[in-house]
């Protein structure tokens, strides 16, 4: 209903306003082209050093652009709007297309987390160790794994934070299992005794920065204050990373190795599932978190978004075509008498076409740059509201996101340029000049 009312309003109100304005004029005035205001100067004419350097045709173009202000703003906003939509659509597609690779190849290097039951016998522990030392496992690392809770997000939901605590002696091995990287400062992060490293999405939900303190709840519903020593790039889930020394400082108790980060020799989807089944069947294994399930969640979301983004891109392209085509046709139709006069004065066909089409080209170029600014703002807004609380989109924008919209508008302008040129080449000058009388 809201969409229908907005569509009706945007279609009917402009038509009503324009018709009402025109009908106030006398019929005799409506039959004649509207003359420019006598002695009027445009803004550029007042900038003397710049105005003197313009050629005659450029001065004519600038005067015509500012003479038809309504059409100028329509072209600017039309091109800028289509560029902004196309930029945002391509930007979102770029932001989500490589999420799995960024999360599970560039950042997370382990294939699964195996959590152990507490207080198990040494015989059961040996069975687990035997499987860990098998040829199917490339490497593994003993860590403390704990799930903390924090209320965050727009709906004030309870967020689960996966906490990984590494032994102090294993500091140099952390990079083999997870790459801790500050995306904004392009800096590699290291664990310290003075705080924990939090995932970027959680930091954004809580508006945290380095040096702040976060209060979380542990499994016993006890409040624990944790100082933020760094913010790491992370696209799936909420994480806290710390070493054993800081864990004991924050929690008041030493950490206990109760889990293993495991990297498999063959990390194929089927092999990960088979190994996860082997681990979960061991009596002293509490649970297994495998990356396959997380990859599937991201893939499902990306596929759904890709279809919606495809529609957005298609609509933005159609908008650009419709806006430029209609405005060009209106421009030619309303100024047919002026163009016939120019042609009678001895201008060649290409010169006549550029006489009027140069305005569209200049305005489209300005509209492209305005659209880039609007598109960046729209992209950042969409990146912040579309993903759920546990997922972050890559906010960076690739070069292709800038090039494709500009190339597309350029292609549309070239096609329409040929259309305008052919139309003006067939123009009957005498008929157009006599039509006013």
Which residue stretches match the model-derived regions?
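Peri-transmembrane interface segments
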Residues: 92, 96-105, 271-318, 331-333, ...
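Small-residue transmembrane helix packing/gating motifs
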Residues: 107-108, 190, 232-273, 292
């Amino acid at each position: 209903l809201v969409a229908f009312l907005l569509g009706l309003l945007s279609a009917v109100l402009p038509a009503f306003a324009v018709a009402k304005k025109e009908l106030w004029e006398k019929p005799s005035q409506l039959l004649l082209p509207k003359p420019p205001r006598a002695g009027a100067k445009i803004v550029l004419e007042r900038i003397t050093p710049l105005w003197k350097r313009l050629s005659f045709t450029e001065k004519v173009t600038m005067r015509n652009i500012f003479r038809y202000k309504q059409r100028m703003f329509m072209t600017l906003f039309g091109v800028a709007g289509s560029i902004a939509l196309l930029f945002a659509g391509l930007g979102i597609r770029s932001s989500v297309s490589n999420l799995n690779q960024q999360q599970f190849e560039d950042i997370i290097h382990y294939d699964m987390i195996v959590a152990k039951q507490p207080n198990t016998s040494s015989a059961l522990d040996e069975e687990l160790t035997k499987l860990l030392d098998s040829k199917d496992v490339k490497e593994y690392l003993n860590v403390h794994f704990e799930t903390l809770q924090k209320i965050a997000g727009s709906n004030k939901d309870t967020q689960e934070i996966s906490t990984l605590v590494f032994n102090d002696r294993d500091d140099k091995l952390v990079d083999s299992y997870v790459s801790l990287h500050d995306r904004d400062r392009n800096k590699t992060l290291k664990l310290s005794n003075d705080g924990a490293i939090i995932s970027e999405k959680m930091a954004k939900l809580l508006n945290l920065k380095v040096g702040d303190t976060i209060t979380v709840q542990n499994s016993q519903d006890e409040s624990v204050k944790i100082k933020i020593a760094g913010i790491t790039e992370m696209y799936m889930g909420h994480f806290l990373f710390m070493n054993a020394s800081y864990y004991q400082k924050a929690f008041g108790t030493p950490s206990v190795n109760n889990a293993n980060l495991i990297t498999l020799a063959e990390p194929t989807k089927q092999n990960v599932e088979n190994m996860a089944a082997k681990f979960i069947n061991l009596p002293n294994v509490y649970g297994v978190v495998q990356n396959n399930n997380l990859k599937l969640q991201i893939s499902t979301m990306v596929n759904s978004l890709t279809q919606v983004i495809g529609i957005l891109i298609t609509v933005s392209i159609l908008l650009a075509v419709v806006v430029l085509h209609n405005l060009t046709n209106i421009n030619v139709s309303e100024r047919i008498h002026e163009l016939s006069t120019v042609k009678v004065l001895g201008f060649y066909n290409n010169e006549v076409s550029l006489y009027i089409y140069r305005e569209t080209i200049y305005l489209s170029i300005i509209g492209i740059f305005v659209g880039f600014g609007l598109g960046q703002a729209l992209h950042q807004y969409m990146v912040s509201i579309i993903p759920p609380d546990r997922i972050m989109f890559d906010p960076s924008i690739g070069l292709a996101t800038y090039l494709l919209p500009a190339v597309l508008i350029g292609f549309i302008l070239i096609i329409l340029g040929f259309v305008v040129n052919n139309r003006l080449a067939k123009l009957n000058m005498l008929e157009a000049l006599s039509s006013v009388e």
